[in-house]
Amino acid sequence: MELGGHWDMNSAPRLVSETAERKQEQKTGTEAEAADSGAVGARRFLLCLYLVGFLDLFGVSMVVPLLSLHVKSLGASPTVAGIVGSSYGILQLFSSTLVGCWSDVVGRRSSLLACILLSALGYLLLGAATNVFLFVLARVPAGIFKHTLSISRALLSDVVPEKERPLVIGHFNTASGVGFILGPVVGGYLTELEDGFYLTAFICFLVFILNAGLVWFFPWREAKPGSTEKGLPLRKTHVLLGRSHDTVQEAATSRRARASKKTAQPWVEVVLALRNMKNLLFSEMWDIFLVRLLMAMAVMLYYSNFVLALEERFGVRPKVTGYLISYSSMLGAVAGLALGPILRLYKHNSQALLLHSSILTCTLLLLYSLAPTMGAVVLSSTLLSFSTAIGRTCITDLQLTVGGAQASGTLIGVGQSVTAVGRIIAPLLSGVAQEVSPCGPPSLGAVLALVAIFIMSLNKRHSSGDGNSKLKSE
């Protein structure tokens, strides 16, 4: 810069300063664009995962309501049909934990794809089953590998911060619940057609193949070896709900497993999975799993004789009861959307929210048992839809908070196994309680919920999420 033909020496620092400011502005703008791009990518990833949950339950719920009718049409007696139905639950009982451990070892992407494809094979075989033996054989792949939702929840726990986790899992449950509402409608329509069950099973197979394709084309990020913790490759410029996008792909593989992955043999991976399971089972989380079992059984007892009880107590036809069940299912799906404001009200204290939702569930089960009119039944069913949906999300979040993210697949797998135990025990308890009264099963459910509340009141150490469990330190 010249003034009267002479260089103004004061302009040099000013010029340097202006240049530095422009560079800083450009850098800030670039970082802001990268952050915005990362936020968009994060939302897209979560929406894809929600769609996976929706398609999974949509496909399954098309077929499952028709299974008992179809196996009967194949010539099975009621006893054989009951054994066939129980076999799926038994397979789930033993496979849930193992598949969860396996997903911690090999990564979420591989395990999720394998589970979806092998489940699809099971439903394809189901559509080809022409006798009871083939029907039972077709249920084996799904019984062992139908853990899409569990692995998806584990993946969600890997990629979102702790405070956002209950909200995101609630939204995932909502998306899955919508699929469970729509699936039976489509399946019921298709089964009216000629060879309707076989057509429905084949369409379910196609839905699972579509789901596998969706997972394959997920916005997974390629990463350099060792660039991530827990095997989640990322780009540092991306952010997922406040956490680095380093945690998006192949979640929850520990550093040791990741480092040795190239040389690890399958039996080594199995040993790692079993060791994780042993650490979990002997951890200090017994009370959380016991609460999960008791609350799951309480709700199962409520639903176990719902149709029969309303018919005996109030003369309600099964068709009307079906409408009430669909209404409750829709409310349960909506409850996931209400988790955000509720969590903010509780300052993200999942244990307090779980305790209060369990108290509400216990009270409503008792109200339903003593309901003098259908109005009281509808009221209790409405509120139960909210309390049980919130409780399921909170107990899952509490497991993950206490157990630590490194074993999220194992944690969710063990939780599913605990629920499977409830599915085996609840029908037996329901049958005994129903011998006394149609109100017996829900009354027993209220008692079990009360025991769970008592256990939660005695064990409040988990509320801080300090990670005292043994898994946290692994």
Curated annotation (Swiss-Prot):
Q: Where is this region: Disordered?
A: 1-33
Instruction: Could you list this entry's UniProt keywords, alphabetically sorted.
Output: Membrane, Transmembrane, Transmembrane helix, Transport
Write down the membrane topology.
Multi-pass membrane protein
Q: Name one GO cellular component term.
A: membrane
The reported result of mutating residue 59 to A is: In a breast cancer sample; somatic mutation
Residue ranges crossing the lipid bilayer per the database entry: 45-65, 80-100, 116-136, 167-187, 197-217, 288-308, 323-343, 359-379, 436-456
Which molecular-function annotations from GO does this UniProt entry contain? transmembrane transporter activity
Tell me the InterPro entries matching this sequence.
MFS (IPR011701), MFS_dom (IPR020846), MFS_trans_sf (IPR036259), Sugar_transporter_CS (IPR005829), Tet-R_TetA/multi-R_MdtG-like (IPR001958)
Q: What is the effect of changing residue 84 to A?
A: In a breast cancer sample; somatic mutation
Report the locations given in the UniProt record: Membrane
Basic and acidic residues: bias regions: 19-30
The record's annotation in Gene3D superfamilies points to:
MFS general substrate transporter like domains
Family, per entry = Belongs to the major facilitator superfamily.
User: What is the protein name given in its UniProt record?
Assistant: Major facilitator superfamily domain-containing protein 9
- State the organism named in the record: Homo sapiens
In the UniProt record, what gene is named as encoding this protein?
A: MFSD9
